[in-house]
Amino acid sequence: MDLILSAVLVLGAIALIAALVLFGVSKKFAVEEDPRLGQVGELLPGANCGGCGFAGCSGMAAALVKGADAGSIDGLMCPVGGADVMGKVADLLGLAVANTEAKVAVVRCNGSCEHRPRIAEYDGLHTCAAMNSCGAGETGCGFGCLGCGDCVAACQFGAISINPETGLPEVDEEKCAGCGACAKACPRHIIELRKKGPKGRRVYVQCVNHDKGAVAKKACSVACIGCGKCQKVCKFDAIIIEDNVAYVDFNKCRMCTKCVDECPTGALVKVNFPVKKKEE
């Protein structure tokens, strides 16, 4: 009995000493967390979408606190929370936030069944990534939308759906958070984040086909053929022609829409503009 009691006392003493040592070490080498990390984290939406460029909201919070210590959080933006959340974060950190314009996902392909006829049938895993790895897909265009919906699966906000009539993804601007997850999921990079623009108006080229004009037009009737007519009519140098396809720089575009009227194939589109009344 005495032997058992002695063993218990010895083990208890060892456990107590070990606990005291561990407590002392933890106090000595403890890394104190900046309380601002938790405060900023509570302001962020918690979507962990990665649209800010970090793995999640905790990474964004750390970057914001680090930026605050450096005196600026310019260049950091939470696309889900938008200007409201960034304003609250800036107030918390005692900084001024740059006026960052909201962005929305746009689908730069108009190759519906009507404009881009199917010439083959794909019989494999129903994902854009899998189909893209096999070649051009079911049409003659090796650049256009594959229509399997990888972008739809990637969207956490239900902002994208495949139109059953056109076979193309459509973005619900009211739901789109501008996180860019859909753009990352698209193997052909036809989805782009663009500034929403004043009153939601935008002008852009709805095509990414880099083939020469005749080849592109044969594959899709509304393809950009790189003719340069839009570039010539633009007075603001907002359009560039690179690798046989036009691109509108939204930082320079003044949305006069002359380029849209000049485009011979309809590859240039304008969104959310008022419908012009026909002259009687």
What feature does the model see in each segment?
Residues 2-233, 262, 266-280:
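Ferredoxin-type iron-sulfur electron-transfer modules and their immediate structural context
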Residues 257:
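Basic, amphipathic alpha-helical segments enriched in Lys/Arg and hydrophobic/aromatic residues
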